[in-house]
């Protein structure tokens, strides 16, 4: 089942990761609310995610990098990915990075190609 969650703490991130990755892939969408590029990337992502079949086994968490900068940096460090915003990080069921992109790399086409893998 696809769903979008907001996480606000490191504990919530760890809980989501531990409960989700057993059965689903996890998308982490990091954004900055006041940024135009983040706004556009979020709209593209929301449209793509909304178009997925309901039975898609994907969970998404959105992270406001202004409000949650330490969490955003923790995720980047844990996954060995440079912190950026907007940024989408796609984890497979094993918790490994399947795809990641930032700014103008976040497109419906790129997401569709990753979904097909």
Could you say what each language-model-derived stretch is?
Residues 49-54, 110-112:
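Short cysteine/histidine-rich metal-coordination sites, predominantly Zn2+-binding motifs
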Residues 84, 90-117:
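Non-catalytic, surface beta->alpha helical segment in thiol-disulfide oxidoreductase systems
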Residues 1-25, 116-117:
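N-terminal leader/targeting and pre-domain segments
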Residues 41-45, 71, 75, 84:
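Amphipathic alpha-helical interface surfaces
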Residues 24, 83-85:
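Short, small/polar residue-rich loop motifs at catalytic or cofactor-binding pockets
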Residues 7, 30, 54-72:
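Thiol-based oxidoreductase modules, predominantly thioredoxin-like and allied folds used
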Residues 15-52:
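Local sequence-structure signature of Cys/Sec-based thiol-disulfide redox active-site neighborhoods
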